[in-house]
Amino acid sequence: MTAPATVPAAVTALRDSRLGRAARARWAGWGSPHLRKIVLVGLGGSALLALGSLGAGAPPVYDPVKRTPVLALLRDPIGERAALAFVYAGLAVLGMAWLYLGRALRRGEEGTDTGRLLKIAALWGAPLVFSVPLFSRDLYAYAAQAQIAHAGLDPYRFGPVSLPGPFLDEISGMWVDTPAPYGPLFLGIGRAVATVTGDRVVTTVFVMRLVAVAGVLLTARYLPRLARAAGGDPRVAVWLGVANPLVLAHFVAGGHNDALMVGLVVAGLTVAIEATEERWVAVGVVLCSAAVLVKAPAAVAVAFLAWVWAGRLSGRAVLVRACVRTGVVAAVSITVITGLTGLGFGWIDQLNASSQVLTWVSVPTAIGMLIELLRGVPNFVTYQDPVIAAVRFGGQVVTAAVLFWLWLRAGRAGWVRMLGLSLLAVVFLGPVVQPWYVLWGLTVLGATRLDRRAWLVFAGTSFWLSMMIAPQGSNLFLDWAPVIAMPLVAAVATIAVLGRSRDEVVEPVAAPGKLVVSAPPGDRELGPVASVR
């Protein structure tokens, strides 16, 4: 009868020990009790996602989970349904914790400084580093393309079908003949990974995920500095660009190489905007050029760095001279890096490889689909439909015009904000939109000064898009149930949590770690297109 009493006694002894007191003191340093609850809830959501990935994620064909006692239960029909519930519950819990974290930030609660927010993001992301790939099978495609390059084949001429073996088994039939659409820097990194990991699928996929995580770490390192230089709030930037459930679910758990592109862009922008000498602006151009050699949309960032260089020049025609210098440095950087990889420029011919995907979130694709629907074309059309192709081409023309207009406005409206809007224009006016693409522009815009409307729009969009890909990677944008339900859920949750702070607006920090809260801005304050440096 005395045995049960020993358990509380042991717990009490541990709590009162030196180790227990140190642990409690360290935990108390995470902020207010309310914030600590938010941290634990978010960690619980992330853990649920990782657990659910074992049964509902995107495992390899030769699945080690099936051969592991106990975990194999998640692969039977009942276990898979339970795992699916874990994933969606975890995503919802993580998303709500993130919204409440944003609310705590707006209110200036203890522990919402930049450093603590970065630690919270790291804590939430840690379980997902070790999960089965979630919301995409792109990691397997990266691994297969890395093997092709490692085998000495041209990844811009040959698809995964050219190299039979365990990696080919992981690729969807839709993509087996498709050459790599990514830049030579990314494929060069993949080739180096394949040299070390060999033909071990799970190991190769895990290391390729670490490449994406490295991109997130780059963003975490430089984004607060970019926000300070651009007149934004570093804490808001971290909340939107690092702790965001879109980042955790798709950049970490999904392992998309967009994470590396965004990290290099943010690093390049930061080095350039902080530069006191022209050579450091050139370094920023080199970093953004390296991002282009991961994914092509980073070229937009290179173009906007001409405005930074122009600010370091004096005399006549400074913008023209800055454009020339930016272009020369970018061209030399791209040529040298491409030459070092030995992979050539064949990736340029593959930039439209993803156009086989149809989603109504792409404005041109949605217009084309609507036209065909009104014409009575049965069911959904394919990407080869002439109307879809024509409208998409028109979208590219409009995109070019919009980008040029935003670039011209950068001198008056702030180049960082105009760059963020330009990247969003590339996404929504492009032929294909995937949820994580929004992070291209959202991360940059998070570094600028945001009003309450921008908070609500960006937060609601992030929450909504984080739920629009099934755990195994299938797109939900053509399924009417989630298309209708998910935006409503995201809007209600965002407004309920963030829309209540009407009387408080976080201003840009006066110094790192110092919070300034003021009354709501009047009409004279600039909103989503405010001028920033």
Question: Can you describe what each PLM-predicted range is?
Answer:
Residues 44-46, 93-102, 203-230, 263, ...:
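Transmembrane-helix motifs of polytopic, lipid-linked glycan transferases
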Residues 200, 229, 335, 353-429, ...:
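Aromatic/glycine/proline-enriched transmembrane-helix motif characteristic
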Residues 301-331:
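Perimembrane helix-loop-helix junctions
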Residues 121, 213-214, 226, 230, ...:
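Membrane-embedded helix bundles of polyisoprenyl
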Residues 83-85, 184, 198-218, 385-394:
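Loop-to-helix entry region of an early transmembrane alpha helix in multi-pass inner-membrane enzymes
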Residues 110-213:
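Intramembrane catalytic core of multi-pass membrane enzymes that act on lipidic substrates
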Residues 1-48, 68-127, 416, 502, ...:
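Start-transfer (signal-anchor) and selected internal transmembrane alpha helices
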Residues 449-533:
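Aromatic-enriched
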